[in-house]
Amino acid sequence: MSQVIYITAHPLDEMVSNSMAVGKAFIESYQESHPDDEVIHIDLFKDEVPEIDADVFSGWGKLQNGETLTEVEQHKVSRLTEIVDQFVSADKYVIATPMWNLSFPPAVKRYFDAVSVAGKSFKYTSEGPQGLLTDKTALHIQSRGGFYSEGPAAEVEMGDRYIRTIFSFLGVPKYKLIAVEGHNKVPERAEEIKLNAIQQAESFAKEF
């Protein structure tokens, strides 16, 4: 049995959001073809993912020195530990995001900051950082109103570029993007674009 972490990063549901609609279709198809696998849903607009702030840095320092943490420090540090432990124990990752201002909602960066932990998801070596998640697989479902797969616009697409890079940094060897793109550029084809992406997602789910 495999464990899948399904991460969503949109404040609206699948009735409005293309990334959420395609993500939902993927997960439903995946569960149908992998009935014994466990899917854990993380909603980055609802679930608590602490910022790495002054409390966290203070708490980490106190842990190293054997000092007592404040209640706030303990809560944030413990929650961050739960998040990274959950992340590294999973076998597969699915993340559905919209493109916001060439990138993604800030909650996505906060989550990857939480799970990028030396000694857990990567390690430092004499040759530089080395990812530890070498037996994992990742899928990114990204909705973007324009066309960013090729041409000049591809150079300014920072969302999938970052997610692909951070998964590689953490050692994940298998990565795929399903892009739902162009629905704002050619609104008359918006429904067709979404349905094509849903079909692609449902098909890929069977082999994921």
Curated annotation (Swiss-Prot):
Its EC number is 1.6.5.-, 1.7.1.17. InterPro entries: Flavodoxin_fold (IPR003680), Flavoprotein-like_sf (IPR029039), FMN-dep_NADH:Q_OxRdtase_AzoR1 (IPR050104), NADH:quinone_OxRdtase_FMN_depd (IPR023048). The keyword Flavoprotein applies. Quinone reductase that provides resistance to thiol-specific stress caused by electrophilic quinones. Also exhibits azoreductase activity. Catalyzes the reductive cleavage of the azo bond in aromatic azo compounds to the corresponding amines. NCBIfam families: PRK13556.1. Homodimer. This is FMN-dependent NADH:quinone oxidoreductase. It comes from Staphylococcus carnosus (strain TM300).
